[in-house]
Amino acid sequence: MAFKTCGFSKKWLVIAVIVMCLCTECYCQCTGGADCTSCTGACTGCGNCPNAVTCTNSQHCVKANTCTGSTDCNTAQTCTNSKDCFEANTCTDSTNCYKATACTNSSGCPGH
């Protein structure tokens, strides 16, 4: 007795796997867009990047490790021209660098 797979063939399975891999790759980097919540790698010019590791000219980068020209960089370790870098070790032209040990033209730095 043969087992029928509801009309799916190996060809469709291969296509589905390729599409899945391509979509997964898209989550790594996002460029532009109002909502990049699915991006986990890098955001550039995005409006909402709460899960990205790296943010450039983006907003709401609450989990980013590195921020450049971005906002809400709450946990970033390195901030350049960014806002709300509460945990940053290094701040350049950034704001609210409360724990920074190296500050250049930034606000909120300890001892400044």
UniProtKB/Swiss-Prot annotation:
Residues 1-28 form the signal peptide. Disulfide bonds join C30-C39, C36-C46, C43-C49, C55-C61, C67-C73, C79-C85, C91-C97, C103-C109. GO terms for cellular component: extracellular region. Keywords: Antifreeze protein, Disulfide bond, Repeat, Secreted, Signal. InterPro entries: Insect_antifreeze_prot_motif, Insect_cyst_antifreeze_prot. It comes from the Eukaryota. It is found in: Secreted. Pfam families: AFP. Its main location: secreted. Forms a right-handed beta-helix that is stabilized by disulfide bonds. The building blocks of this beta-helix correspond to tandem repeats with the consensus sequence T-C-T-X-S-X-X-C-X-X-A-X. Belongs to the insect antifreeze protein family. Monomer. Contributes to protect body fluid from freezing at subzero temperatures. Lowers the freezing point of the hemolymph by about 2.5 degrees at a concentration of 1 mg/ml. Binds to nascent ice crystals and prevents further growth. This is Thermal hysteresis protein YL-1. It comes from Tenebrio molitor.
